[in-house]
């Protein structure tokens, strides 16, 4: 009986199953983006501008990582206009968390989601990262070599003369 019912359903609706699954996937993605606004109240929506002169801009105030509890997260700010910035500090001072906060909030904003910041302005740019790179024993790639390959990809992308931000942690 169940097999017959499934066959009838498949004949009637089976050709549309891909469309149905894509719609469900899109709804789930939108719910995921919206859920941040339900659980957190320290967010804003980004002001995103086109980058016309290859000098991308970022201006964040009180930027936080969305996966760190509200009471534990430390907000930081940064303003860059087409510059290079090297972030230094002692071990366990939050450098990696800050880089991750920048990257994840940029990606969330570009997807139309909220950013965990009191103010968030950015240009449209490609987000490239070399954070927590791992080796690949099967391919004979050490961690150091994997990092070099990521940075090589970044320099190759730079040849396109397109706006980008490179977030590199510990070479």
Question: Predicted regions span which residues?
Answer:
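Amphipathic alpha-helical domain-onset/packing element
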Residues: 17-48, 59-61
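Short coil/turn segments at secondary-structure boundaries
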Residues: 4-7, 39-43, 120-121
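Long, non-coiled-coil amphipathic alpha-helical linker/lever segments
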Residues: 1-26, 134, 138-141, 150
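ATPase nucleotide-binding head domains, primarily ABC-like/P-loop NTPase cores
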Residues: 33, 44-171
């Amino acid at each position: 009986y169940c097999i017959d019912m499934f066959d009838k359903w498949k004949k009637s609706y089976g050709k549309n199953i891909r469309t149905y699954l894509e719609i469900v996937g899109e709804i789930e993605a939108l719910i995921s983006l919206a859920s941040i606004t339900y659980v957190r109240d320290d967010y804003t929506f980004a002001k995103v501008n086109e980058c016309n002169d290859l000098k991308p801009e970022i201006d964040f105030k009180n930027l936080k990582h969305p996966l760190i509890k509200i009471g534990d997260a430390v907000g930081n700010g940064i303003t860059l206009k087409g510059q290079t910035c090297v972030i230094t500090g002692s071990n366990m001072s939050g450098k990696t968390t800050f880089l991750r906060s920048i990257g994840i909030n940029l990606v969330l904003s570009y997807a139309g989601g909220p950013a965990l910041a009191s103010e968030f302005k950015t240009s449209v740019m490609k987000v490239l990262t070399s954070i927590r790179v791992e080796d690949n024993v099967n391919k004979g790639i050490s961690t150091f070599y994997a990092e070099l390959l990521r940075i090589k990809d970044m320099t190759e992308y730079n040849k396109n003369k397109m706006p980008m931000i490179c977030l590199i942690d510990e070479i």
